[in-house]
C-alpha cells in the first residue's frame, strides 16, 4: 500500500517536473525568434544550448530501463529537451554567419555525441547489473547537471558588481528554482542521490538568484530610469528588454555615468 502511494506521488511529481522543465527548455524561444527575424545571431552564444544538450543526452542515458529502471518520465523530458536544443542549435548554425563558428559548433556536437555513445557502450558492455550502471552513469550525470545549475554564477557576480538585474531575468530564475525543487523532491521518492544532489544544488543557486532579485530590484529600477533620462532613451524601458539596449560589458561604465561618478 505504502509502495503504491510512493509510486503515485513520484509519478505526479515527475509529470509536474516534466511540465516545468519543458517551460525551462522553451524559455529561449523569443531569443531565437529574434535571431530568425534579424537573420543573425548577433552576440548570442551557443554555449548554454550545447551544455543543455549534453546534460539531456546523459540524463536520457541514465533514465534508460537497462541503466536505471522505472525512469520513463526522466527519459521523456530528456528526449524532449534534446529535440528542442537541436532545433535551437540548428537555427544558430544557419544564422551564425561565420564558417569558423559553424566548425566550432559541429566539433563540439561531435565530441558530445562521441562521448555519450562511448559512455553508453562501455557501461552496457562492461557492467552487467543496473545498480552498477546507475552508479557509473549517475556520477557523470550528477556532475554535468550540477555544472549546468552553476552556470549562472557569472551573471550573479555581474548583478552584485553592478547592482543591476538587467541580465538576470526574474521569470527564468523562478522557473529554474521551481524546476530544481520539483526534481529534488522526485529524487527523494524514493531516494536517488544522482537526482537529489545536483537538483538540491540547483535549488540553492535558484534561491540565491531570487534573494539577489529582492535585494537589487529597487536599485535596478533607479539605475534604468536615470539611464533612460541621461542617455536619451525613448519610451518605456522594462527589465525584460534591457538586454536589447545595453551590452553587459558596458553596464559598470553606464552605471558610473548615471551616478555622476
From Swiss-Prot:
Domain of life of the native organism: Eukaryota
Extracellular side: 1-11, 68-74, 124-134, 190-193
Localization of this protein: Cell membrane
Function: Mediates both low-affinity uptake and efflux of sugar across the plasma membrane.
Name of the protein in question: Bidirectional sugar transporter SWEET6
Annotated source species: Arabidopsis thaliana
GO biological process: protein homooligomerization
Gene it is expressed from: SWEET6
Cytoplasmic side: 33-46, 96-102, 156-168, 215-261
Keywords: Cell membrane, Membrane, Repeat, Sugar transport, Transmembrane, Transmembrane helix, Transport
InterPro entries named among the record's database cross-references: SWEET (IPR047664), SWEET_rpt (IPR004316)
Residues annotated as transmembrane: 12-32, 47-67, 75-95, 103-123, 135-155, 169-189, 194-214
Any one Gene Ontology cellular component term annotated for this protein: plasma membrane
UniProt family annotation: Belongs to the SWEET sugar transporter family.
Membrane topology: Multi-pass membrane protein
Gene Ontology molecular function, alphabetical: sugar transmembrane transporter activity
